[in-house]
């Protein structure tokens, strides 16, 4: 029986570096996979941290996300725009709600996400938000959560 997989990554390319090998195999074996990218991925190194200043680069990055995910036949990509390397400036509940919205739409059986003790703050918060969004409830679809590290 095929399963639905949801990759939840803090930044563009974390999904590629973290779990694409495993997910590619699972898709090849008949499972369906989806990706949720939480952060915009560009502004942390910009002096003013302005999304407006990085608009052209962000558009290119979004096309690259689509291209990379199409390589392993990701069915749909969801992109949020939380501030790059500043998830700690966002209420955890806002990140949890973004995850819940996607989770409720696709009802995944399996989630791949960041390792809880990763050094990157966005990765830590992503893990925490995933665990919160998948807490044991009677109608919870997620049966397995796998963590990956991005080195």
What residue ranges belong to the model's regions?
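Active-site rim/loop-helix segments in enzyme catalytic domains that contact anionic ligands
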Residues: 1-106, 135-139
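Active-site adenylate/phosphate-handling loop in enzymes that bind or generate adenylated species
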Residues: 98-144
């Amino acid at each position: 029986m095929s399963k639905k997989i949801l990759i939840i990554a803090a930044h563009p390319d974390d999904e590629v570096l973290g779990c694409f090998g495993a997910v590619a195999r699972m898709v090849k074996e008949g499972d369906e996979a989806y990706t949720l990218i939480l952060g915009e991925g560009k502004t942390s190194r910009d002096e003013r941290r302005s999304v407006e200043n990085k608009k052209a680069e962000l558009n290119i990055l979004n096309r690259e996300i689509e291209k990379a995910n199409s390589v392993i036949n990701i069915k749909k990509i969801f992109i949020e725009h939380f501030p790059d390397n500043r998830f700690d400036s966002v209420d955890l509940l806002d990140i949890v709600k973004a995850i819940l919205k996607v989770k409720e739409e696709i009802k995944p059986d399996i989630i791949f996400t960041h390792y809880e003790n990763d050094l990157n703050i966005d990765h830590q918060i992503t893990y925490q938000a995933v665990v919160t969004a998948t807490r044991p409830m009677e109608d919870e679809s997620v049966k397995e959560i796998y963590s990956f590290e991005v080195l």
